[in-house]
């Protein structure tokens, strides 16, 4: 989406992607959810003392 619309503001892109995500079925979302869990576990293992500090 960013490559197709290089001048689109990030907030607009987030809205559109969020709308597309809501249209996906649970089965379509599952690979992304599973990958996020895998990456979260990997990050926690690699950086056990990490604390998010905005």
UniProtKB/Swiss-Prot annotation:
- Please indicate if the UniProt record lists Disulfide bond as a keyword: no
User: What's in the keyword line of the UniProt record?
Assistant: DNA-binding, Nucleus
DNA-binding region location: 1-54
Can you name a GO cellular component term?
A: nucleus
Enumerate the InterPro entries for this protein: HMG_box_dom, HMG_box_dom_sf, SRY-related_HMG-box_TF-like
| Annotated GO MF terms | DNA binding
Its Gene Ontology biological processes? developmental process
Q: Where in the cell is it found?
A: Nucleus
Kindly give the Pfam families that the UniProt entry links to this protein: HMG_box (PF00505)
The cysteines joined by S-S bonds are: none
Specify the superkingdom. Answer: Eukaryota
Name this polypeptide is given: SRY-related protein CH2
Q: Which organism is it from?
A: Gallus gallus (Chicken)
Main localization is nucleus
